């Protein structure tokens, strides 16, 4: 058959200019020098943590925690992160942002003018505080409840209502049908402060985190600074297993129909279910062409 005659495709080579390392605590880092444009760099921290890890009484906490990363850390109290970055031309919502998805949460500081070492150090310190040193002050949490309540309210359009009807049927028997990151208004308005702190301590930990720095930087210096700044962060005792949720097989085609009086258009989604692909298999050309 054609499938049997298909030659084995080679693996995708790792860019030799990317410095990849892992600290003893499990945190992974990726650093690459790139002079286009000059004197600019991007900083990321990615967490393999999203709304899928929430329990029913935590729905919305992954997204809420993302918001709280801009509301006070040990080294940048209050709006300190936003205020300091604005002094170097990095603006919230433009070059400074984050997103929460079902499976991951990613924070970015982009287009940073790395014209002196102190700026690089401070951006890494922000990543450090996001990773391990959020304040999560009660007054700030309560202030953010109103912000996220409004985000939830304005997001309750026809498409969201249709998603909430269709997803539990499309992903029947799986948490994926019930974990849109915005969560539920009951949780947003009423969760106890400690619930958010517990979620942070449980899941924001080195073995689930990766640092990415790309730009006009000295790779050796950045690597040394990451080792100096992040190596002290300890894994929690008896860390919870990061379970990767599955979606049950189905023999018959699943068909779901959702209607809403405010949606005048017909929208059709066709989803093809396939076995989960392990990360190590994603580095081959075969994965890209399949």
Listing of model-derived features with the role each one plays in the protein:
Residues 5-6, 173, 210-268, 272-276:
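An aromatic/glycine/proline-enriched structural segment found at the starts
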Residues 5-19, 107-110, 117, 125, ...:
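Histidine-acidic residue clusters that define the catalytic metal-binding segment
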Residues 7-45:
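Mature N-terminal segment immediately following signal peptide/propeptide cleavage
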Residues 18-20, 28-34, 197-202, 252-260:
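Short, surface-exposed beta-strand/loop micro-motifs that present aromatic residues
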Residues 38, 47-161, 190, 194-208, ...:
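Active-site-adjacent, His/Asp/Glu-enriched structural segments that form or flank metal-binding
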Residues 108-112, 131, 256, 264-290:
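Extended catalytic-interface subdomain
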């Amino acid at each position: 058959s054609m499938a049997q005659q298909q030659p084995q495709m080679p693996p995708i080579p790792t860019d030799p200019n990317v410095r990849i390392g892992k600290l003893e605590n499990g945190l992974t880092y990726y650093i690459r020098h790139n002079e286009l444009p000059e004197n600019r760099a991007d900083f990321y921290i990615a967490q393999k943590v999203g709304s899928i890890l929430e329990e029913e009484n935590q729905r919305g906490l992954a997204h809420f925690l993302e918001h709280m990363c801009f509301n006070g850390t040990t080294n940048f109290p209050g709006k300190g992160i936003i205020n300091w970055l604005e002094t170097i031309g990095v603006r919230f919502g433009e070059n400074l942002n984050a997103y929460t998805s079902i499976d991951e949460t990613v924070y970015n500081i982009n287009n940073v003018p790395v014209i002196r070492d102190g700026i690089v150090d401070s951006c890494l310190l922000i990543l450090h505080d996001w990773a391990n040193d959020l304040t999560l002050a009660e007054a700030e949490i309560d202030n953010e409840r109103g912000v996220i309540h409004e985000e939830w309210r304005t997001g309750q359009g026809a498409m969201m209502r249709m998603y909430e009807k269709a997803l539990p049927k499309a992903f029947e028997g799986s948490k994926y049908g019930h974990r849109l990151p915005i969560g539920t208004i009951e949780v947003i308005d009423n969760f106890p402060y400690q619930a958010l702190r517990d979620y942070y301590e449980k899941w924001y930990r080195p073995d689930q985190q990766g640092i990415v720095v790309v730009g006009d930087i000295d790779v050796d210096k950045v690597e040394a600074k990451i080792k100096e700044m992040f190596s002290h962060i300890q894994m929690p005792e008896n860390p919870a297993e990061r379970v990767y949720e599955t979606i049950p097989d189905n023999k018959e085609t699943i068909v779901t129909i959702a209607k809403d009086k405010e949606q005048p258009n017909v929208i059709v989604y066709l989803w093809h279910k396939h076995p989960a692909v392990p990360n190590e298999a994603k580095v081959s050309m075969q994965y890209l062409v399949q």
